[in-house]
Structure formats: C-alpha cells, structure tokens
Amino acid sequence: MVKAIMHGCNGKMGQVISGLVKEDDVIEIVAGIDKFTGIENPYPVFTSLAECDVQADVVIDFSNAAAVDELLDVCVEKTLPVVLCTTGLSEEQLAKVKEAGEKVAVLRSANMSLGVNLLMKLLKDAAKALAPAGFDIEIVEKHHNQKVDAPSGTAIALADSINEAMADQYVY
C-alpha cells in the first residue's frame, strides 16, 4: 500500500482527497500537514512537513504558494516524491520546482481532472488548426470574488497548451 502525506489536508481539496483515499485499498494517508489544525482527521496532523516524523512514500500537495518553498526543500532533503497541485506559484518558485525535479520525482499539475487535461489536448489541436487561418485565441474566466489566484492555475495551464502549439508566439 502506498503511504501518502496530505500537504494542505484541512483545505477544501485536502479534505476531498482524504475522503476519496478512505475508500481506496491502494493508498492511505498516514499524516497531514496544515497550519490550520481545527479539523479532526483520522491521521496525525503537523503544522509543517519538517516536523512530520511519519514515514511515507509520497507527498500529495494541495496547499498554497506560501507553503511550497518549504515543501520542496523538505522533499529534496528526505528524497520524498511529491505530487504538486498548488497553483499561483511565482517564477522563482517554478524554477525551484524544476530544480527539485532534478533531485526527486515531482509531478506538477494545475488541474488533475480528466476533463481539463482532455481540454488541454483539444486546445493544442485547435490552436494548430485555427491560428494559421488567422483566428485569435482568448481565454476568459469568471470566479467568485474570494478566488485566491487569478488568473487560475487551470487558465494558465490552458493558455500554456495553446502557446505550446503556437511555438510560444503569444503573450499573456
């Protein structure tokens, strides 16, 4: 069984993932990391990954950009693979993700849903067909006024898919 640490365990996605994992017989969450400890979980929760003494095979991260630097440092130090799903990272943090990926396995995705990943592929194909014919491609998104990262990580990933198909011609 895969033993995972849920980084950002008390956030919305952390709680969703924790609930899904309870129903799975291939993976278990053995510890959680979150600054907010006011939610009861079926595993021990630590306020930082550095203080977590529970052995695990991987860290699943749905936290926030402010927590990513320490996360990467500790994962590299402990040679602990990480699934990085936090969005809103700075250019410096993205460079740090790339650097960490040279030392430990890092899977980074702005959106893990099958539908969004299919949409990214479809957008690449559409961009290859439409742009040479003179079409402009634009992404417009709407969110509630409490949205933490705008544009969203998903919108940036969609734009990156289009831009990749267009040999990085577009600026956003």
Regions found by a protein language model. Give the residues of each.
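Rossmann-fold NAD(P)-binding glycine/threonine-rich loop
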Residues: 72-73, 77, 86-108, 117-119, ...
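N-terminal Rossmann-like NAD(P) cofactor-binding module of classical short-chain dehydrogenase/reductase
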Residues: 59-60
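Short glycine-/small-residue-rich Rossmann-like dinucleotide-binding loops
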Residues: 63-64, 87
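Short amphipathic alpha-helix with an adjacent loop that forms part of the alpha/beta core around
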Residues: 46-55
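NAD(P)-binding Rossmann-fold cofactor-contacting core
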Residues: 23-42
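Active-site-lining helix/loop region of Rossmann-like oxidoreductase modules
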Residues: 2-20, 46, 127-172
